[in-house]
Amino acid sequence: MVATFCAVSAPVILNEYNAVASDSYLGGGNAAADAGGGYACDTFWGRVPGNGGDWFELVVIQDHLDLRGWKLDIYENGVLDETLDLTNHPLWSDLRAGTIITVGEDLPTDAGYNPAAGDWWIHVQAADGADGVYIEPSGFPVSSSNWQLRIRNAAGTVVFGPAGEGVSPAAGIGSDEVFRLEADPSASIAANSPDYDGGSDMSTFGAPNQWGRQNFGALRT
């Protein structure tokens, strides 16, 4: 693993990723109830096997950020598995602070992004056979096996990460959990922040995290 922790005034950060195995449910158990007798679920996917499949979520911190040509390096167990390149599409050229970006294999792209109208979410599909308009059309893993993400700008300079299990927390993300930031997103969030942890009660694909309630107000002003 490349032990680089770029975090001071990070322009974009990792907010959440799905570590739930394809044959498991969030919080364990079955379709009717989690292992504790509750109903752990995702606010978008509901309670489904795999909790939506391979996906992760970023938050834009720097206002008017240009992500054209940036690179998302994905590691499992300390080994670089895949690099997903963002394209030069104009969508990436002027992102507002507080924007949520999800990258997933299964859900088709939804780039209907309009912060002025209250739509702060961009979803792009990275999968073999996807259209490749916004991101490299290549499948990628997300798992509970020391999964980490590193973000590089168009020049190849590391601007954040790697972040994930094995950095913070050091271990303990289970195959029935998500990894999430349990703090308000800001430029002070480091890749090794102690506010990164696992959760099995709820996940929030494309929305602010809930363990308490993540507040985007300081970014979306």
Question: Model-derived features: where do they sit?
Answer:
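A recurrent domain-boundary module in secreted/ectodomain proteins
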Residues: 1-6, 198-221
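Activation on beta-sandwich/Ig-like modules and their edge loops
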Residues: 6-146, 152-198
